[in-house]
Amino acid sequence: MNGRVCAVYLSLGVTVALLLLIELPAMRAASTSAADRQGSPLGLARGRLVVASRGLSDANFAETAVFLLDYHQRGAMGVIINRPTEVPLAQVWPDMAGLQQRQETAHIGGPVATRRITLLIRSSRPLEDAQQVIDNIHVSTSQTLFARLVDRADAVEQFRVYAGYAGWGPGQLEREVARGDWHVLPADAATVFDTAPADVWPTLMRQGAIRWLRF
C-alpha cells in the first residue's frame, strides 16, 4: 500500500475503524471520447446528481443524492453528498494545525473503496491538482492541495472530504435509472455546499416532483 496510513474511527451507531489514505494518486482524467461527452439518453452525465427514489431500499443509498464525478461507457462513479459523520477532520488529521480551529467533519462518500479520500472544492477559479466538474465545483484526491486549503488563512474556497465512493459497472446505473431506482437532476454548488445534508434529499425530491430532468 502506497502512502502514509492513518486510522480513523467513525461513530455511526457502532465504532467503525477506517484506514484513510493520506497520500493518493491523482484522479483519472475525465474521458474525452465523443461517446463519453454525449452522456446518456437518460440524462446521465458527469456533474449530474442521481437522487434515490422513495422506493430504493438499499441501506447504502436510501434517501441519498450522489454527485457524479465520472460517467462513461465503462461505468460511473460519484460521492454521496448528504451523509456527514460526526467525526471532525481535526480528529482524522491531528497533526494538521490548520484543522484544529475548523468545524468541518468527514463525510461518507459511498460503500466502495472506503480507504479512498475525495475532496470536493468550491472555487470560482481553476485549482492546481484539481479537475473542474461543473461551474464552481472541483474534485481532487491531492493531499498537497488539501494541505494548501487548510493552511491558507485567507482561503475563500470551501471544501468537503469524503471517504469512499459510489460506483457502477458498465450499464448498471442506466438499468437502475430505467427501472426507477434513481432520478437524474442537474447539480449546483449551492446544493452541494450550502444546503444542510438533512435537507438535500427532501429538497431534491420536491424539485423532482415538479419536473425530472429528461433528454
Feature roles, as predicted:
Residues 1-3:
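N-terminal secretory signal peptides that target proteins for export/translocation
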Residues 5-215:
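A short aromatic-anchored loop/beta-hairpin motif
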